[in-house]
């Protein structure tokens, strides 16, 4: 019946035909119903036997030629497999080839292992970097420069490996993204084993072949996957030289019966199905019974184990204390070591600073500083340094800088005499003694004062040999030296050696010395300084993170490091046994420093003050371990390493820090015991077996003032000396110890242990503790008395008022004045007069100048970045601006809860904040959240590198639970997944139930830490465009980079002194300003929204597409701020975009297409871009940097030896470029001159980001150029432009021409601003390029440029990079300060050959910066350079009157702009968005098409608009006259300037009279003309006179005493009237007879004839007023057309 029912349902389509239904009856199928199964029949399966024994090591792979014989043999059906292929370990070659093949997208068998990565990549550096990066992640201990080594030699052939990070991840990704459901890694292994007999290791090898040839898409079925694996296995077999035979399993029934074969795949699938069913049932029961399956079954055992371990830990902690356990934790890591050996660059800095900076002024005033400086130069002497000194000295002789000649001569002598001499430490010890005083306020002060009766070099030696209190020689009392065993007194010899060392110095050249315990201010640190001065290679340890101590040691090395010296700083805990072993092993190991120590100074110590015997605890045990037990361990490790390397003829000298304090002081824990314990080593030399490895010298260190251990006792040092004990300064004791390492004393030490006593007689002092106690009591009593007297005086003064009131010493809190920072104006007499030759060779109208600039970056504005770059910290004003920018404070001017208040308040609490309090309150927050730092998700659109999100594709192995969705969405699922999705409509709704079935592939989000790019130069936290005044409705619509740029451009106008950008159009046409802002990526956030968010089905704005275009940002700038019709050009030069923008604008202005341009670049920091850079290995690996102990602020290290990639940044940089005459006319500040620029591509290649040298073409010329007579530097009567110079052909390079146009040579370049990205390749290529250019152009050797690497503080912002660099160069010229590259802790030794560059690591004040060269490189063969010249050269082209006039106007403009900017900042209105165009719509066309249209300023409101009746703004008569005269002055001869000024004043007076003092009058037209009388000769031409003058005019002229003046004045008047009529000209030769100038009693009158009358009436003129003003050699005619409807007065 059941069967019939089902059959009927199938026929009626109520049930699918393929439904699998089983019918069981209890009478026939009772076992099946009760789940009873028969026991499985045992089948004898013959185990496969490998007849060949497996080799112990991996067999050598056969050559490919042999592999051709390999084959896959199909198995005959009846024959069972009896052999299994031997499993072998993976070889490095297999992994290497797989990784390379995958990157190159080539078959794995086509990769020859005899070639290197570089050869295989065929010049593609990005690909090469990726492969090498994968190798470093995959393997350990790779050789240096693995890209140059053949693949087969990269990893030892005998090394068997497991998969590394990269290969494991690739296999995992292959399985998850390309294999069908349930065909996971385990299934793949089983398949290869069951079918081909491959073991687990060979299966992995097959999968390595698979990752080199992945399927293009996910394989649709298990069968397809098996076919893919079969093909891959065959390729592997071909390479491995093995034969694959398909395996099968056979089962036979007895003789002659039927036989059957069991398919293992089917069996495995059945087993898996049953297991899955059982698991489901188990989980369902667990859920029903509320059993937590995730809870460990052995929870009680785990808890018991935890209790046991905790008890052990508690016992250890109770015995040793947590402090002890923490104190012995190892900290040594060779990765955290820092190396300093760039003594050569420090020498260059010193010499260059001497000749170009203000160093000579300091040295001239301080004889001791001068002597130390000369010693430093002599210790760094070399041929190149001598050549540099001589070259700069010759230049100084020409410039004659006062006081420098003598210093230069002495410096040259010091260097030349020491070139072949090893470095020598000359220690200058001014003998000092302690002095303790008590002030009137009761303050106890300790000072060092000179000792009486001693002076000179040997003063310290004299002190040591002075007589004691009884008048006896005291040498043996203060210091002594004895042989520890024979007790031979060697004191006199040591004293002689001390005198010799003080006089001649000590050399430690070539010595390797380890010093522990050399913290700042310690004896050890001073010993390090002396050793470095003597040329030693010193390894010094620090117990703190290197980042906190590195600056101190870097500065020490720069001050003291001599030639051949080296300082290695490493973190080390001497209390840790492991650190003691690891440090010494690292020094001796060939993979470490590979050095044998000449000396060890285990000076590490810790204070134990205030601890008596009853208080001794775990801390004292820790210190005892550090100062005694660990010293033994460390020395023992030295012995072991020497013996392992058979070093038995070079004992390492050990200077043991002993003490005369054998409990003398008391209360110092186990300090004395530790020192006494070390003394035992003196005897162990004879009683133990290591005398060939170590030479012991005990050093009893006496009372040393100023150390960390003795600080508390310094105030009683004077009392101790009063009792005949000698105390030492830190420098004196360090000298004593260093002297023991001189060759003579080392020889004595090797013969027998020495005991050097520098106790100063302390051990002989009786009752030391009582003396100290009494002295301390006396001092404290004196202080108490002084304080009591002062308090009494204060009370008496308050009561009687008879005593004088104390003067107030509390400083008045300073207010901050926020200023834009306009450039200083040079003094005409001192700075411009010496350059007067430029007045005749340079035309301002053919000059491009920078009149404004701004930036927005990790340090905020350009001003703030400069403070950090040049000084390392913010000023008070800087902190104020930064706090405002980060929304920590806001300005109020109005009523508050505490009354009316004007000033800053806290943004959150509203509490008032004084300017002087800002640093204290917000300084830490500001420093933490600005600059280069860990990426803040808030500042990067939510991107968190610690949780970088990816989509992981998986194949669904089980049907997923149903979920509800709309019918449209459900159909979309079906469209994507087909039959792998089932849809069931929900009755009564439009929704469906959707179930994703087994076999579907889905993507699951996952988060992975992405530490590589987790550091960046982000905008200061809290920055908001709203603070700048951008309307809130625009902020979400625009991409962040557009917001950055709008804010930047607005601020750049303020820096140009322009408070309203529309003012520009008073002077130039709307079309004459260009917008050349560029970007490398454009609106990254909006681009991501358009591509990724649409894919993720997120809501996005409908016009997001427009925000992704690179030119959209420039469009927003124009639409919101300017409304110009000039060109918008959007350069895209990757990281060189900024230079390309400048280059394009320079060409545009010089070709007269524009007169002003906005240039610069903008870019964002974005997740996808950051990941892209990391895959190219271009950016710094943050994880590795942190492992090296680097702080985020240290990770951008241009030119440093340890640099490892650039740090990304974002923001915007802007400049406003302007034609020189426009800048003068407007009275704009001039920050610098753009003298020349270029862009260049590079050679043939395959690598887009590879650094090139195509930019060398900027210096292209045929040998040393010989300038012809028309050159500006040789012919002072010709005016030339940069463009004409650049076209001089092969003899003059564009670079030379750029400088020559301003009378400068290649030697006058002072600064090179480097692209300096902190990548290995760029930072070597760029200096090489610049040095080649300098060599080719003949720059004098020995005159290096200062190399500025700005990215050390900003990171690399891509497109704005060159804009920020240019801003920095302008600030360098104005401040005359060369900023430091503080992160270049050790300049790469490879840059020593770049002799035309000096890399400053400290700021340098210089006397002048004449010119700079800026270089930038971008991916995609974009190279560019810009030459800039100081603004004084531009001003030198002006005569004094013009310059003074300009100075007045620019000063007024600057003050106005400063006030306006401060007001705008405090009111959050820096950006003033234009709501509408400054003209009526109906006037637009004629304004656009009239080149003379100009905007009008409203005198009452200060706003700007185009006057419908006067679109040319001719009504502004005075302004027009001023502009005309100013322009003429620029072109006039110097001797004609005064006459021009006289005529101008007369014309201005007439205009004042006519206009009543108003700037505008009700006029229709104005005409102005100027005639230079010295150039006027037309009156001699009869034809000219006949055509242009009426009979009356000719008669008047001929009756005049000066006919030339008469005709010239009438001609100027005619021209002015003609301009006033605004009629269309008939050409230059048109007659002017229709305009007649009639003599009148008061002023000349105008009489028009014929067509001119019509023109006047057409212009709506009722009258034309005329003035002719005379100067000495010129005259000015002004014609004003008066509008009106009355009878025309000009018809007479």
Swiss-Prot record:
Gene3D superfamilies named among the record's database cross-references: 3.30.70.2490, 3.40.47.10, 4'-phosphopantetheinyl transferase domain, 6.10.250.1930, NAD(P)-binding Rossmann-like Domain
GO biological process per UniProt: long-chain fatty acid biosynthetic process
InterPro entries: 4-PPantetheinyl_Trfase_dom, 4-PPantetheinyl_Trfase_dom_sf, Fas_alpha_ACP, FAS_alpha_su_C, FAS_alpha_yeast, FASI_helical, Fungal_FAS, Ketoacyl_synth_AS
Catalytic activity: acetyl-CoA + n malonyl-CoA + 2n NADPH + 4n H(+) = a long-chain-acyl-CoA + n CoA + n CO2 + 2n NADP(+); a fatty acyl-[ACP] + malonyl-[ACP] + H(+) = a 3-oxoacyl-[ACP] + holo-[ACP] + CO2; a (3R)-hydroxyacyl-[ACP] + NADP(+) = a 3-oxoacyl-[ACP] + NADPH + H(+)
Organism: Dothistroma septosporum (strain NZE10 / CBS 128990)
Name of this protein: Fatty acid synthase alpha subunit hexA
Induction trigger: Expression is positively regulated by the dothistromin-specific transcription factors aflR and aflJ.
Function (record text): Fatty acid synthase alpha subunit; part of the fragmented gene cluster that mediates the biosynthesis of dothistromin (DOTH), a polyketide toxin very similar in structure to the aflatoxin precursor, versicolorin B. The first step of the pathway is the conversion of acetate to norsolorinic acid (NOR) and requires the fatty acid synthase subunits hexA and hexB, as well as the polyketide synthase pksA. PksA combines a hexanoyl starter unit and 7 malonyl-CoA extender units to synthesize the precursor NOR.
């Amino acid at each position: 019946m059941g069967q019939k029912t089902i059959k009927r349902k199938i026929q009626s389509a109520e049930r699918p035909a393929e439904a699998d239904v089983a019918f069981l009856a209890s009478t026939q199928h009772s076992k099946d119903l009760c789940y009873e199964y028969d026991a499985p029949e045992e089948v004898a399966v013959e185990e496969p036997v490998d007849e060949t024994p497996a080799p112990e090591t991996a067999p050598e792979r056969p050559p490919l030629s042999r592999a051709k014989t390999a084959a896959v043999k199909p198995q005959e059906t009846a024959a069972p497999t009896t052999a299994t292929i031997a499993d072998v370990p993976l070889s490095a070659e297999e992994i290497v080839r797989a990784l390379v093949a995958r990157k190159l997208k080539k078959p794995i068998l086509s990769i020859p292992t005899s070639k290197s990565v570089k050869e295989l990549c065929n010049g593609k550096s990005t690909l090469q970097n990726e492969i090498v990066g994968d190798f470093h992640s995959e393997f350990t201990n790779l050789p240096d420069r693995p890209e140059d080594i053949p693949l087969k030699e990269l990893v030892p052939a005998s090394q068997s490996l497991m998969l590394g990070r990269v290969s494991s991840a690739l296999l995992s990704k292959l399985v998850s993204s390309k294999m069908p459901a349930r065909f996971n890694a385990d299934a793949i292994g089983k398949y290869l084993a069951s079918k081909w007999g491959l073991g687990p290791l060979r299966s992995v090898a097959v999968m390595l072949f698979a990752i080199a040839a992945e399927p293009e898409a996910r394989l649709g079925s298990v069968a397809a996957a098996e076919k893919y694996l079969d093909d891959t296995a065959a390729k592997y077999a071909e390479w491995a030289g093995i034969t694959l035979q398909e395996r099968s399993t056979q089962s036979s029934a007895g003789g002659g019966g039927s036989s059957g074969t069991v398919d293992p795949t089917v069996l495995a699938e059945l087993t898996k199905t049953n297991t899955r069913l059982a698991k489901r049932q188990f989980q369902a029961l667990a859920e029903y019974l509320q059993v937590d399956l995730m809870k460990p079954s052995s929870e009680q055992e785990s808890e018991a184990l935890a209790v046991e371990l905790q008890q052990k830990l508690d016992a250890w902690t109770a015995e040793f204390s947590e402090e002890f356990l923490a104190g012995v934790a190892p900290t040594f890591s060779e990765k955290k070591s820092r190396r300093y050996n760039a003594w050569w660059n420090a020498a260059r800095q010193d010499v260059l600073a001497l000749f170009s900076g203000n160093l000579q002024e300091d040295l001239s005033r301080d004889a001791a500083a001068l002597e130390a400086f000369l010693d430093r130069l002599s210790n760094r002497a070399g041929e190149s340094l001598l050549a540099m000194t001589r070259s700069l000295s010759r230049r100084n002789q020409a410039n004659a800088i006062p006081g420098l000649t003598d210093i230069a001569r002495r410096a040259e002598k010091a260097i030349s005499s020491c070139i072949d001499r090893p470095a020598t430490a000359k220690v200058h010890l001014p003998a000092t003694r302690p002095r303790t005083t008590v002030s009137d306020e009761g303050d106890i002060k300790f000072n060092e004062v000179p000792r009486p009766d001693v002076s000179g070099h040997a003063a310290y030696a004299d002190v040591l040999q002075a007589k004691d209190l009884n008048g006896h020689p005291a040498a043996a009392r203060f210091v002594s030296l004895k042989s520890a065993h024979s007790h031979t007194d060697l004191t006199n010899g040591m004293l002689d050696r001390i005198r010799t060392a003080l006089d001649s110095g000590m050399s430690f050249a070539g010595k390797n010395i380890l010093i522990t315990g050399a913290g700042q201010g310690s004896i050890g640190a001073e010993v390090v300084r002396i050793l470095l001065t003597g040329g030693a290679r010193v390894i010094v340890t620090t117990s703190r993170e290197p980042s906190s101590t590195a600056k101190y040691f870097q500065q020490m090395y720069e001050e003291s490091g001599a030639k051949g010296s080296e300082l290695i700083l490493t973190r080390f805990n001497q209390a840790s046994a492991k650190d003691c072993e690891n440090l010494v092993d690292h020094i001796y190991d060939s993979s470490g420093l590979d050095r044998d120590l000449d000396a060890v100074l285990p000076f590490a110590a810790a204070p134990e003050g205030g601890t008596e015997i009853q208080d001794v605890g775990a801390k004292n045990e820790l210190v005892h371990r550090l100062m005694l037990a660990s010293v033994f361990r460390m020395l023992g490790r030295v012995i072991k390493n020497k013996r392992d390397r058979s070093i038995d003829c070079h004992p390492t000298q050990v200077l043991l820090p002993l003490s005369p304090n054998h409990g003398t002081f008391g209360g110092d824990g186990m300090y004395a015991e530790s020192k006494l314990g070390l003394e035992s080593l003196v005897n162990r030399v004879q009683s133990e077996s290591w005398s060939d490895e170590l030479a012991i010298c005990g050093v009893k260190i006496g009372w040393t003032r100023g150390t960390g251990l003795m600080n508390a006792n310094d105030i009683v040092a004077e009392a101790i000396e009063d009792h005949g004990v000698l105390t030492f300064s830190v420098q004196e004791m360090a000298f004593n110890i260093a002297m023991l390492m001189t060759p003579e004393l080392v020889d004595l030490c090797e013969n027998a242990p020495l005991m050097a006593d520098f106790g100063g007689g302390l051990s002989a002092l009786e009752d030391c503790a009582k003396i100290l106690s009494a002295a301390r009591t006396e001092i404290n009593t004196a202080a108490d008395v002084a304080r009591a007297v002062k308090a009494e005086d204060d009370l008496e003064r308050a009561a009687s008022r008879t005593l004088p009131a104390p003067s107030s010493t509390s400083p008045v809190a300073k207010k901050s004045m926020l200023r834009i920072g306009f450039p200083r104006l040079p003094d005409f007499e001192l700075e411009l007069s010496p350059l007067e030759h430029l007045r005749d060779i340079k035309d301002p109208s053919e000059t491009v100048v920078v009149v404004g600039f701004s930036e927005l970056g990790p340090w905020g504005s350009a001003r703030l970045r400069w403070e950090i770059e040049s000084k390392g910290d913010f000023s008070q004003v800087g902190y104020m601006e930064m706090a405002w920018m980060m929304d920590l404070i806001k300005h109020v001017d109005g009523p508050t809860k505490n009354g009316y208040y004007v000033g800053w308040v806290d943004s959150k609490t509203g509490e008032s904040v004084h300017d002087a309090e800002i640093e204290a309150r917000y300084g830490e927050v500001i420093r933490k959240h600005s600059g280069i730092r860990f990426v803040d998700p808030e500042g990067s659109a939510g991107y968190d590198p610690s949780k970088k999100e990816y989509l992981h594709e998986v194949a669904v192995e089980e049907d997923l639970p149903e979920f509800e969705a709309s019918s449209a969405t459900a159909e979309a699922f079906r469209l994507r997944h087909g039959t792998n999705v089932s849809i069931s409509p929900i009755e009564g709704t439009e929704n469906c139930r959707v179930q994703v079935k087994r076999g579907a592939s889905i993507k699951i989000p996952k988060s992975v830490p992405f530490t590589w790019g987790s550091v960046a130069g982000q905008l200061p936290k809290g920055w908001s465009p709203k603070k700048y005044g951008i309307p809130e409705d625009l902020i979400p619509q625009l991409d962040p980079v557009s917001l950055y740029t709008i804010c930047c451009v607005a601020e750049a106008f303020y820096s140009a002194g322009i408070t309203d950008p529309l003012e520009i159009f008073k002077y130039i046409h709307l079309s004459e300003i260009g917008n050349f802002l560029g970007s490398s990526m454009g609106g990254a956030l909006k681009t991501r929204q358009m591509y990724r968010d649409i894919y993720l089905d997120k809501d996005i704005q409908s016009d997001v597409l427009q925000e992704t275009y690179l030119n959209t940002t420039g469009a927003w700038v124009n639409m919101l701020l300017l409304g110009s019709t000039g060109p918008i050009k959007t350069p895209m030069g990757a990281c060189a975009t900024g230079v390309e923008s400048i280059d394009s604008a320079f060409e545009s202005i010089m070709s007269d297409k524009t007169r002003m341009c906005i240039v610069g670049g903008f870019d964002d920091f974005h997740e996808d871009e950051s990941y892209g850079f990391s895959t190219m290995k271009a950016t710094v690996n943050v994880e590795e940097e942190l492992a090296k102990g680097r702080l985020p602020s240290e990770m951008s290290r241009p030119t440093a030896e340890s640099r490892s990639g650039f740090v990304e940044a974002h923001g915007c940089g802007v400049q406003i470029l302007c034609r020189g005459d426009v800048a003068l006319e407007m009275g704009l500040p001039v920050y610098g001159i753009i003298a020349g620029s270029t862009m260049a591509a590079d050679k043939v290649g395959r690598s887009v980001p590879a650094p090139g040298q195509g930019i060398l073409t900027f210096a292209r010329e045929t040998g040393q150029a010989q300038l012809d007579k028309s050159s500006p530097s040789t012919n002072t009567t010709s005016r030339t432009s940069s463009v004409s110079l650049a076209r001089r052909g092969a003899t003059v390079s564009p670079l030379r021409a750029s400088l020559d146009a301003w009378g400068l040579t290649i030697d006058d370049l002072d600064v090179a601003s480097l692209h300096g990205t902190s990548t290995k390749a760029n930072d070597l290529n760029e200096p090489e390029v610049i040095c080649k250019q300098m060599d080719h152009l003949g720059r004098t050797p020995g005159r290096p440029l200062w190399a500025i690497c700005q990215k050390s503080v900003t990171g690399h912002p891509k497109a704005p990079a060159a804009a920020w660099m240019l801003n920095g160069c302008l600030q360098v010229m104005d401040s005359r300060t060369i900023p430091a590259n503080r992160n270049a802790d050790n300049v790469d030794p490879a840059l020593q050959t770049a002799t035309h560059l000096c890399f400053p690591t400290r700021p340098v004040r210089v006397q002048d910066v004449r010119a700079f060269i800026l270089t930038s490189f971008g991916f995609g063969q974009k190279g560019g350079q810009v030459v800039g010249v100081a603004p004084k050269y531009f001003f030198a082209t002006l005569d004094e009157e013009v310059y003074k006039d300009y100075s007045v106007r620019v000063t007024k403009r600057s003050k106005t702009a400063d006030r306006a900017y401060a007001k705008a900042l405090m009111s959050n209105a820096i950006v003033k968005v234009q709501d509408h165009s400054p003209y009526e719509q109906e006037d637009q066309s004629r304004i656009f098409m009239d080149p003379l249209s100009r905007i009008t300023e409203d005198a009452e409101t200060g706003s700007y608009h185009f006057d419908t009746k006067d679109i040319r703004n001719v009504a502004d008569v005075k302004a027009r006259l001023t502009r005309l005269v100013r322009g003429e002055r620029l072109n006039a001869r110097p001797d004609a300037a005064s006459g021009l000024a006289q005529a101008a004043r007369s014309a201005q007076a007439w205009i004042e009279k006519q206009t009543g003092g108003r700037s505008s009058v009700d006029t229709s037209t104005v005409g102005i003309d100027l005639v230079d009388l010295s150039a006027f000769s037309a009156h001699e031409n009869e034809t000219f006179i006949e055509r242009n003058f009426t009979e009356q005019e000719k008669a008047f002229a001929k009756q005049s005493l000066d006919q030339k003046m008469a005709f010239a004045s009438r001609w100027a008047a005619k021209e002015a009237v003609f301009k006033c009529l605004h009629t269309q000209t008939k050409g230059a030769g048109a007659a002017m007879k229709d305009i007649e100038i009639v003599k009148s009693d008061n002023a000349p009158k105008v009489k028009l004839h014929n067509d001119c009358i019509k023109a006047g009436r057409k212009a709506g003129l009722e009258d034309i007023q005329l003035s002719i003003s005379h100067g000495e050699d010129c005259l000015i005619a002004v014609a004003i057309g008066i509008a009106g409807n009355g009878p025309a007065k000009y018809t007479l």
